[in-house]
């Protein structure tokens, strides 16, 4: 796959950025009330059918544990054995029992609620299969497992009857979210080994395979800011541009850590260096950005140079986070959606490394994606899709409590947390439209399969982050030391300031006499 332009990585001057296209018209709408109130904000893709699927409410951890322990015990009893025999048999029964229970529960559990009324259209209204066997198997009310659909769509064996995002808005009408045999094979032989190992060589290969796909590839949906993290909506009553949303986010990051002139800032997983440039120009910070992707470093350092920022002030380095000298101290540290690539097993150690590199009076901004505890089976199917096709090796998307626990175990104190899932949905909606607008270029260079994988990723992620399947957290932490002057942090507790300002503006900030 070519990633070079005239012998070097693509730089901003090589890219013809487009203006984000208008959103496609919903041609699948029933025109009927879905059964629940809907939104009408121009800032996001509003949901026409926000249905809940089966999930945690029908799940029983007690039943699972009983089956895992009881079946080998029962087999041992039938064979005339004892506890040691049961333990030995459990080696062979654990995975089959897990597979059977997850398959049955994901296939036959009812929806959490039926507040949203599904249109009840046949599968063929939404999908056109290329083979007779597929048409015969998935027709009428016989829905296709979503995991199966992915591979059929990417290999051209099925087409969507409309815009991908719109068809996915009605996915409960044509798809199920049950686990398949292929799902378990992937979990067992790819996902779990990645989670357990997370070797340095493995991380390097996965990151470079992903983020060194080609700067042009990312430019075709990220736009001129080249930021692969969520932007921020400042006004839900209008459709801000992608660039406005990303500038909003960059300003918020800098303000939340009270960045000031002369501060040394370490940006771990710096991407194409846009935050480094923003912080250098607007705040006079001295920024060191690190990433494993060579193309990102070339793009970012070129951007710093074009902006007139001397290398002595700010620069990007191509290195592993584990190679950052721990004896070097920084006033501030930022990491935007990088921790997911560290792995759940290594998070606390990674945060401790950050702790050791941070000045005692410094602060760290952590932006991480997460999943809800009140899960639905769809969330798992979507998460595995991300791991398989988009972010190989990224397994650290967890509920908020896990991140907080890791940060506190590393010695930090949480100063603030904001949930920005709906902002991510708005960002992804714009990325999706950019991707469609560059469809011909993508297909010509990377092929139809590649285009379709990212088409579904961006479309489905727009929905997932809007409905809560996944979200994103902005967490600001400081060192939990007695000598920390916490009063200085009051100035940047913007959640408190915003709430109080709203009350004052409404004249509701005092108890009436």
UniProtKB/Swiss-Prot annotation:
Any Pfam family the entry gives: CMAS
Enzyme Commission number: 2.1.1.317
Metabolic or biological pathway, per its Swiss-Prot or TrEMBL entry: Lipid metabolism; sphingolipid metabolism
Location relative to the cell: Membrane
Disruption outcome: In contrast to the knockout of its paralog MT2, has no effect on methylation of GluCers and exhibits no growth defects. However, a double-knockout with its paralog MT2 is not viable.
Major enzyme class: transferase
Reactions listed under catalytic activity: a (4E,8E)-4-sphinga-4,8-dienine ceramide + S-adenosyl-L-methionine = a 9-methyl-(4E,8E)-sphinga-4,8-dienine ceramide + S-adenosyl-L-homocysteine + H(+)
Membrane topology, as annotated: Multi-pass membrane protein
GO molecular function: methyltransferase activity
Stretches that traverse the bilayer: 63-83, 85-105
Annotated Gene Ontology cellular component terms: membrane
Gene Ontology annotations of biological process type: methylation; sphingolipid metabolic process
Binding site for S-adenosyl-L-methionine: 228-229, 265-273, 291-296, 321-322
Keywords noted in UniProt: Lipid biosynthesis, Lipid metabolism, Membrane, Methyltransferase, S-adenosyl-L-methionine, Sphingolipid metabolism, Transferase, Transmembrane, Transmembrane helix
Gene3D superfamilies: Vaccinia Virus protein VP39 (3.40.50.150)
Main location: membrane
PANTHER family: SPHINGOLIPID C9-METHYLTRANSFERASE A-RELATED, SYNTHASE, PUTATIVE (AFU_ORTHOLOGUE AFUA_7G04190)-RELATED
Family per similarity comment: Belongs to the CFA/CMAS family.
Function per UniProt: Catalyzes methylation of the sphingoid base component of glucosylceramides (GluCers) at the C9-position. Sphingolipid C9-methylation requires 4,8-desaturated ceramides as substrates. Glucosylceramides play important roles in the growth, differentiation and pathogenicity. The methyl group at the C9-position distinguishes fungal glucosylceramides from those of plants and animals, and may thus play a role in host-pathogen interactions enabling the host to recognize the fungal attack and initiate specific defense responses.
Protein name: Sphingolipid C9-methyltransferase 1
Organism: Gibberella zeae (strain ATCC MYA-4620 / CBS 123657 / FGSC 9075 / NRRL 31084 / PH-1) (Wheat head blight fungus)
Lineage, opening ranks: Eukaryota, Fungi, Dikarya, Ascomycota, Pezizomycotina
């Amino acid at each position: 796959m070519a990633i070079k332009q005239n012998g070097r990585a693509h730089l901003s001057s090589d890219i013809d950025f487009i203006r984000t296209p208008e959103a496609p018209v919903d041609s699948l709408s029933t025109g009927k009330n879905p059964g629940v109130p809907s939104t009408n904000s121009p800032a996001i893709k509003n949901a026409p059918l926000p249905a809940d699927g089966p999930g945690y409410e029908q799940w029983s951890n007690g039943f699972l544990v009983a089956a895992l322990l009881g079946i080998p015990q029962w087999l041992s009893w039938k064979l005339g054995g004892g506890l040691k025999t049961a333990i030995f048999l459990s080696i062979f029964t654990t995975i089959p029992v897990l597979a059977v229970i997850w398959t049955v529960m994901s296939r036959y559990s009812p929806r959490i609620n039926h507040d949203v009324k599904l249109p009840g259209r046949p599968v063929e209204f939404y999908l056109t299969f290329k083979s007779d066997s597929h048409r015969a198997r998935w027709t009428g009310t016989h829905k296709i497992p979503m995991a199966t659909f992915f591979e059929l769509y990417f290999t051209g064996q099925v087409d969507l009857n409309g815009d991908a995002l719109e068809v996915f808005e009605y996915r409960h009408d044509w798809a199920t979210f049950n686990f398949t045999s292929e799902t378990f094979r992937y979990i067992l032989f790819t996902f779990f080994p990645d989670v357990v190992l997370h070797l340095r060589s493995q991380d390097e290969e996965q990151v470079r395979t992903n983020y060194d796909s080609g700067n042009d590839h990312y430019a075709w949906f990220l736009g001129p800011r080249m930021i692969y993290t969520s932007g921020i909506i400042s006004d839900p009553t209008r459709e801000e541009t992608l660039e406005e949303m990303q500038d909003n986010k960059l300003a918020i990051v800098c303000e939340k850590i009270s960045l000031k002139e002369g501060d040394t800032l370490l940006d771990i997983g710096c991407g194409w260096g846009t935050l480094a440039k923003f912080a250098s120009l607007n705040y006079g910070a001295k920024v060191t950005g690190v990433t494993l992707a060579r193309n990102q470093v070339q793009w970012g350092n070129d951007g710093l140079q074009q902006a007139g920022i001397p290398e002595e002030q700010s620069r990007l380095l191509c290195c592993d986070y584990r190679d950052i000298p721990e004896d070097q101290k920084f006033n501030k540290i930022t990491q935007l959606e990088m921790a997911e690539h560290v792995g759940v097993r290594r998070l606390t150690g990674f945060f401790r490394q950050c702790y050791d590199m941070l000045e005692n009076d410094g602060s760290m901004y952590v932006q991480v994606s997460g999943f809800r505890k009140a899960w639905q089976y769809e969330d798992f199917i979507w998460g595995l899709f991300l791991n398989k096709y988009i972010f190989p090796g990224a397994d650290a998307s967890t509920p908020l409590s896990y991140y907080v626990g890791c940060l506190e175990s590393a010695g930090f104190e949480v100063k603030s947390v904001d949930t920005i899932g709906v902002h991510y949905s708005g960002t992804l909606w714009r990325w999706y439209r950019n991707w469609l607008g560059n469809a011909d270029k993508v297909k010509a260079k990377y092929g139809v399969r590649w285009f379709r994988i990212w088409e579904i990723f961006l479309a489905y992620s727009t929905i997932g982050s809007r409905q809560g399947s996944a979200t994103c957290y902005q967490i600001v932490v400081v060192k939990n030391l007695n000598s920390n002057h916490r009063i200085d942090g009051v100035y940047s507790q913007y959640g408190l300031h915003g709430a109080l300002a709203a009350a004052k503006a409404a004249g509701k900030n005092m108890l009436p006499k």
